[in-house]
Every structure is written in structure tokens, then in C-alpha cells.
């Protein structure tokens, strides 16, 4: 297994923000040319990132034959869209290195638990918007997620919201307009990839 750490920060990122990759070593004796890659976003209410939803989960995906990566994204005091842009940078990085890493570029999946599920789903609904590609100065095609795994995700900012997550995510942007924008069940569109959702 090849393990590396990559800088995926933007100007509002926290110092610890990074992507850790867990790539299955390529072997001529194994007939698999490329593998899917899962980018994991641990939960933590946008207050911290939970280690129990990081490496242990990544290793389970590796054991099942997937490449994996963990995004240790920026949380409070960082606000929307800092973590979203870090996830976009991570998808861009994986797709740019797909040939070298033996990743199937059409099977890059974002996964998230709890608030990390909100981040993964946010990426699923916002990846094609101009503010993402313009900020990274890349084409939208390279940012496209091919699927989502949403593990007990925070989704709604409405009646059943996990208020702490939205307080931490929005902080001084905590307005009705931004609550509506980040209530992801209201943002589903034709660009959203297929999702596996479990609770």
C-alpha cells in the first residue's frame, strides 16, 4: 500500500487540512488495471473531524479492493465553502493522478459520515457551480464526482436539522438565504451523482 499526504488548502483553510491517500500497490500478478477510489470525509459537526470515521474506515475500503483517501478538512472557525473547496481540490488531485495511481477516473466517489456526509452531499450538489471551478481555475469536468456514499448524513437545515453543524459551518453567514442553500434536500439537480444513503 502506498500512503502519502497532500496539501489541498485554499486561502481560508486551517493549517491541518490535508488529503491522506491509501493506494493499493499495483502488481502485474493481479489482473486489475485500475480501481475505484473513495474520498472519505469524517464527521464531527464541522467542529472537529472524527478519527473513528477516518483511517479505520479507509482500511475497510482498501480491504474490499478500493483505493481510499481521507480528507481532513477545515472546520470551525473555517466556514462555507472552505471545506467544499478542499474536497474539490481533492477530486481534482485524484483525477489528475489517475493514470499514475491506477485509479479509474470514472469511479471517483465521495463518502461522508454525519457532518462529513453533509460535506460530501454539498459537493454532489455544488461541484458544477461556477464558484467552485473559478476558484480552482479548472474545468468542471475534472471536478465531477461519480458517486456519493452518505453515511447517516446531516442534510437538512429545517425542522430536523443538527443545529450545531449549521452554526459551525455558517457562523457569520448564518442567514435564511444560506440556511436554504445548505439545506441539501432542496438543492438536488441533474448534476447530482448517484448516491447510496444509509442511516
Task: List where the protein language model places each region.
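Short amphipathic alpha-helix adjacent to the substrate-entry channel of hydrolases
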Residues: 32, 50-69
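Short beta-to-alpha linker loops that shape the active-site pocket of alpha/beta-hydrolase fold enzymes
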Residues: 25, 44, 67, 72-76, ...
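Conserved serine/cysteine hydrolase catalytic core
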Residues: 183-192
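Primarily recognizes the serine-hydrolase "nucleophile elbow" in alpha/beta-hydrolase
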Residues: 92-163, 179
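Short beta-strand/loop motif that positions the catalytic acidic residue
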Residues: 191, 196-199
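N-terminal cap/lid segment of alpha/beta-hydrolase-fold proteins
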Residues: 1-33, 159, 163
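Short beta-strand element of the alpha/beta-hydrolase
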Residues: 34-43
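Catalytic nucleophile-loop/oxyanion-hole region of alpha/beta-hydrolase
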Residues: 49-51, 70-105
